[in-house]
């Protein structure tokens, strides 16, 4: 059983069809892990600015 997402409305589900719009849901993949964080400096700057 994998998590799926409706491409039309963006809802997440475990079913083959979206309960909201009856569109066929697709399997989602997480972003690839990399020890080199390309956007880390931007994320840290935003976090520092919010404090």
Curated annotation (Swiss-Prot):
Tagged with keyword Glycoprotein: no
Residue ranges the record marks as coiled coil: none
One GO molecular-function entry: snoRNA binding
Superkingdom of origin organism: Archaea
Name this protein carries in UniProt: Ribosome biogenesis protein Nop10
This protein's GO CC annotations: ribonucleoprotein complex
InterPro entries noted in UniProt: H/ACA_rnp_Nop10, H/ACA_rnp_Nop10_sf, Nop10_arc-typ
Family: Belongs to the NOP10 family.
Biological role stated in the UniProt entry: Involved in ribosome biogenesis; more specifically in 18S rRNA pseudouridylation and in cleavage of pre-rRNA.
Transmembrane segments: none
Entry's Gene Ontology BP terms: pseudouridine synthesis; rRNA processing
Family annotation (NCBIfam families): PRK13130.1
Organism: Methanococcus maripaludis (strain C7 / ATCC BAA-1331)
Pfam hit, one: Nop10p
UniProt keyword list: Ribonucleoprotein, Ribosome biogenesis, rRNA processing
């Amino acid at each position: 059983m994998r998590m799926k997402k409706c491409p039309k409305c963006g809802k997440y589900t475990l079913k083959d069809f979206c309960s909201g719009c009856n569109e066929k849901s697709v399997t989602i993949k997480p972003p690839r892990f990399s020890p080199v964080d390309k956007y880390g400096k931007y994320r840290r700057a935003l976090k520092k600015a919010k404090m």
